[in-house]
């Protein structure tokens, strides 16, 4: 769960930078995309996108109606692109979904426990970046 202290920080951040916030996701959109992808999103991701939509808060986090600065790709499109990439590399990895990318074609992924990874498409290696969205926001917005 995203801690209340972190959530308050995010609320203030998006008040200061409203152009970085998307349109909040609905429960129907979330369920529909989970069904399409065959994945259950982590509660932290759901909490974030229900409040802020696809938004940029230290990392661009894609949902359905993203801030124009995040781009138009949805979590569904990013995840399906990641799944195709894995098929090319013959590395089945289910239960991961793409919430972002690093700008070089490497998807940023979240697992069902809320851990955040980067998948290096050139080497087919994965590295954990953050234990949770909460730790991502603390590090990127507070520098902790």
Feature annotation, model-predicted:
Residues 1-107, 141-144:
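A surface-exposed partner-binding patch
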Residues 64, 121-124:
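Short, highly charge-biased, low-complexity peptide segments
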Residues 103-106, 115, 123:
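Short, solvent-exposed loop/turn segments at secondary-structure junctions
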Residues 107-109, 127:
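Short helix/loop capping segments that flank catalytic or ligand/cofactor-binding pockets
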Residues 111-113:
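Short acidic-glycine loop/turn motifs at beta-strand connectors
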Residues 126-144:
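Compact, glycine/acidic-enriched structural inserts
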């Amino acid at each position: 769960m995203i801690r209340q202290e972190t959530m308050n920080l995010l609320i203030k951040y998006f008040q200061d930078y409203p152009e970085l916030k998307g349109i909040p996701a609905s429960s129907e959109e979330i369920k529909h995309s989970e069904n399409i992808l065959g994945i259950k999103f982590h509660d932290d991701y759901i909490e974030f996108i229900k409040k802020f939509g696809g938004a940029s808060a230290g990392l661009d986090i894609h949902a359905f109606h993203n801030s124009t600065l995040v781009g138009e790709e949805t979590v569904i499109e990013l995840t399906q692109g990641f799944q195709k990439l894995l098929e090319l590399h013959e590395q089945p990895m289910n239960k991961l979904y793409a919430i972002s990318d690093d700008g070089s074609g490497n998807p940023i992924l979240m697992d069902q426990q809320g851990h955040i990874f980067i998948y290096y498409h050139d080497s087919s290696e994965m590295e954990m970046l953050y234990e949770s969205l909460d730790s991502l926001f603390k590090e990127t917005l507070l520098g902790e």
